[in-house]
Amino acid sequence: MKLFKTFRNKTHTSRWLFADSYSNDWKNRAIKLMDLFKSHEYIENSKNQVVEYGCGCFAPFYNLYNGKDGFQVSKYDLVAWDKETNVIDLNSNELTLPITNISVFSGVIEYLNDVPSILRKAIQTSDYLLISYAFVPSALFLDEGKFLKTINNRAIANGWRNHYTNKYLVKLFSNIGIISAIDVWNGNQSLFLIRNPKLDKFE
């Protein structure tokens, strides 16, 4: 059993060590996510530190926004794609996250073992979270066969470790922070901008 678990975890991790596992189209998702922040929370001429988790070889937030419009982007991933990439394993039991204005999880939380715990850590070190998630359509609950087939495909083909509906995501994110804005990308991924409640406290 221990050998199987080791193999399984290495298989899911090793996929992201190679550039051909990433799609350059994900930059469009990054643009739409950042537009959520710019449209709802951005203050003109402000300076914002951004941490891009799971940046991949294309690092869309870093390449699109670093050094522009007051954004300074740091990129993090399982592997150091270049000297600017910080290595991090978000599933580590000893996870420590950097303090920043915006933490980005674009195409990332599907692979996390303990989403609530990690996002609670993230909101404690961030003013905002930008999150994308490939959700499970609620309509699938009306057909158990299709539902199970979908979950099986998510688990085996994609290696995803959690399977949430938008209803669950809204509840989860509302317990972590304040949902500032929501959008949809590509018809099957929800985009969330979450604000740290501390920003609403007046001294």
Predicted regions and their residues:
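Conserved N-terminal segment of class I S-adenosyl-L-methionine
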Residues: 1-94, 98, 190, 201-203
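Core SAM-dependent methyltransferase catalytic element
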Residues: 181-203
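A short, conserved alpha-helix within the catalytic core of class I
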Residues: 112-125
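Short, well-ordered alpha-helix to beta-strand connector turns
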Residues: 47, 100, 125-127
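A short SAM/SAH-binding and catalytic strip from SAM-dependent methyltransferases
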Residues: 101-114
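Conserved beta-strand signature within the Rossmann-like core of class I S-adenosyl-L-methionine
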Residues: 126-138
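Short alpha-helix
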Residues: 155-177
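Class I (Rossmann-like) S-adenosyl-L-methionine-dependent methyltransferase catalytic domain
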Residues: 45-46, 144-162
